[in-house]
UniProtKB/Swiss-Prot annotation:
Residues bound to ATP: G10, L11, E12, G13, A14, G15, K16, T17
HAMAP family listed in its UniProt record: Thymidylate_kinase
Catalytic activity: dTMP + ATP = dTDP + ADP
Keyword Glycosyltransferase: no
Gene Ontology terms: biological process: dTDP biosynthetic process; dTTP biosynthetic process; dUDP biosynthetic process
One Gene Ontology CC term in the entry: cytosol
Originating gene: tmk
Keywords: ATP-binding, Kinase, Nucleotide biosynthesis, Nucleotide-binding, Transferase
EC number: 2.7.4.9
Protein name: Thymidylate kinase
Function: Phosphorylation of dTMP to form dTDP in both de novo and salvage pathways of dTTP synthesis.
Length: 210
């Protein structure tokens, strides 16, 4: 089977780290062992510096929505061109913590940025490049933020309003319903049930790829 790019998406507190472990375990069970991990924003030296700016901001200066969006795409193109595409070319599988769907949901939905701008930027930066499979972990903003707060101090984006995350989730769900490559998993359930659902979804998808 050819190498694939699998992305895990969801709101803060959706359980992406646990999901990654479940995905890797299932891939290994199917004999896939050459796997690399990526995260967005980040994943290269430049992208990691941009991650810090995006998540923490700069003291005394407001980060505009447009600046945030452009930094995200700058980090993304560095990761895609310098890490993800080379890994796929050599036959490795890539499991990513977030990708472009996050921008479509957070900036397009949460921030309410212009859809035309979002699509133009996506096309200019990524072209036709897209994940082979996206696993969207769906949680309500209330549950997600409760889990995120339990982890400790919140970053700049995690401190956004409940309405922001409600809009973000609505955009996630709308995008998922319109794209068969995005599989939605109910992540409000107990961990064991979420893990089982992820593994079942991934197994079925892998069988379809053969």
């Amino acid at each position: 089977m050819n190498s694939k790019f699998i992305v895990i998406e969801g709101l803060e507190g959706a359980g992406k780290t646990t999901a990654r472990e479940a995905v890797v375990s299932e891939l290994q069970r199917h004999g896939i062992n050459d796997i690399i991990f990526t995260r967005e924003p980040g994943g290269t030296p430049l992208a990691e510096k941009l991650r810090e700016l995006i998540k923490q901001g700069v003291e005394g200066e407001r980060v505009t929505d447009s600046a945030e969006l452009l930094m995200l795409y700058a980090a993304r193109v560095q990761l895609v061109e310098n890490v993800i595409k080379p890994a796929l070319a050599r036959g490795a599988w890539v499991v990513g913590d977030r990708h472009d769907l996050s921008s479509q949901a957070y900036q397009g939905g949460g921030r309410g940025m212009d859809a035309g701008l979002m699509n133009s930027l996506k096309q200019a930066v990524l072209g036709d490049f897209a994940p082979d499979l996206t696993l969207y972990l769906d949680v309500t903003p209330q549950i997600g933020l409760q889990r995120a707060r339990a982890r400790g101090e919140l970053d700049r984006i995690e401190q956004e309003s409940l309405n922001f995350f409600t809009r973000t989730r609505e955009r996630y769900l709308a995008l998922a319903s319109a794209d068969s490559r995005i599989k939605t998993v109910d992540a409000t359930r107990p961990l064991e049930q979420v893990t089982a659902a992820l593994q079942q979804t991934l197994t079925q998808w892998l069988q379809e790829q053969r």
